[in-house]
Every structure is written in C-alpha cells, then in structure tokens.
C-alpha cells in the first residue's frame, strides 16, 4: 500500500518509473472526493502531491447515477458471466470497482470453454472433433490433477478469483491440445459448476454425463 497517512488516504502502489498510486479510498473508508484531486496536463493527481490517480471508486447509488442493473447484465452477458465476474473480482467482503469490460472478459472465458468442447462451425450443437475417449497423456494428466487440487483448495478457502484463474489456465492449455479427453473435460465441468452452473450443466449433458453435474 502506498503510505499516504499524512493525508489519510490509501491506495495500491503502481511502480511505473515515477511516483504513482491508484488512490481508491480515504483511511476511514469513505470515497475520495473531487476536491482532493487536481488536474495537471490531462492527468489527475492527489492534490499537492505527485501521486497520480489512476482509478477512483464511488459507491453505487441512484443519486450518482452509477447503479448497474443486474437484469441488463444478465440479458447482455448471461447469468453465468455475472456470477463469475462477481466471484473473480476478489474477496467477497472487499470493496471493488465495477467494470463492464471485466464482465465482457469473463464472458469471453466462458465462450472459450464452450469452444473447447463444442464445434463452433457446425450448423448444430455437436462436440468438436478434438473430443476423444482416449486417456490423458502425461502433460494433460498433470495439468488436470494440478487444476483439481488448486481449484478445490481455493474454493474451500473462498479464494474464488484464484480458482477461476486456474480454470482459465486449464482452458488455455487444453484448447491447444489436438485431443481433449472426454473424462478430463467432465472433471473440469465439475470444478466449473459452482461458478458457471448453467454452462457447466449444458456441456455436461452434451458430453454424455450422467445425472446432474452439480451432484
């Protein structure tokens, strides 16, 4: 944290060759007001300092006009994307800046999961040619076991953002594989299910999984 006790303000330090910090909150937890910043040459700084303000958080409220309608997010991005983004933003009890770009990024991840299993060029919904009933090779098995262990541990510790990050790594790895074992995909969907239940359930069914993936 940047040490700004003299001004009663804290933020995350950014080392980019000069003095810069992301000023988010005052020490008492209240928002940083506009009169505590100043404009210089197109940039915003903490008044009287060389600390550059790269982001400033405001609580959502109707009076500020910055309320996000969850129904609109679900309509445009899907319920899984909204759920996953809220979990990916960090500790649930922490105050976090809302970003629609972030929601879009999470939706892109879910789309990659879909393309990892489904043939996106087919006229109907069918498994892609890479899905096989062969066993995992050594690298695939290691990646699968590491992912199961990491996601399980992080989920139990409620470190949801790092669990999601590990699932992203899994998806990137297996997307590059010419063969994607069906059982590895099903194991991954079990991990994904608490985070993106609708997508996980649909893909589980398409892979021939028995019953409900959440059970």
Language-model regions: role of each:
Residues 2-7, 45-79, 93-104:
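Conserved phosphate-binding loops in nucleotide/dinucleotide-binding enzymes
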Residues 1-59:
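Glycine-rich (often Gly-Gly/Gly-Pro-rich) flexible segments and glycine-rich loop motifs
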Residues 71-215:
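Helix-rich, typically C-terminal accessory recognition domains appended to large enzymatic cores
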């Amino acid at each position: 944290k940047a040490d700004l006790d003299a001004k009663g303000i804290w933020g995350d330090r950014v080392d980019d060759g000069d003095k810069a910090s992301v000023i988010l909150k005052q020490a008492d937890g209240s928002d940083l007001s506009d009169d505590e910043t100043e404009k210089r040459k197109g940039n915003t700084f903490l008044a009287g300092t060389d600390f550059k303000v790269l982001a400033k958080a405001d609580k959502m409220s109707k009076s500020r006009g910055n309320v996000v309608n969850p129904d609109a997010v679900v309509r445009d991005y899907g319920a899984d994307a909204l759920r996953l983004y809220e979990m990916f933003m960090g500790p649930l009890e922490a105050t976090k800046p809302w970003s629609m770009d972030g929601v879009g990024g999470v939706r892109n991840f879910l789309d990659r999961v879909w393309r990892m299993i489904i043939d996106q060029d087919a006229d109907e919904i069918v498994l892609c040619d890479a899905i096989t009933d062969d066993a995992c090779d050594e690298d695939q098995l290691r990646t699968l076991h590491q992912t199961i262990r990491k996601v399980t541990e992080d989920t139990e510790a409620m470190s949801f953002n790092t669990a999601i990050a590990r699932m992203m790594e899994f998806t990137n790895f297996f997307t590059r594989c010419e063969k994607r074992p069906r059982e590895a995909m099903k194991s991954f969907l079990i991990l994904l299910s608490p985070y993106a239940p609708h997508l996980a359930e649909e893909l589980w069914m398409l892979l021939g999984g028995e019953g409900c993936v959440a059970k």
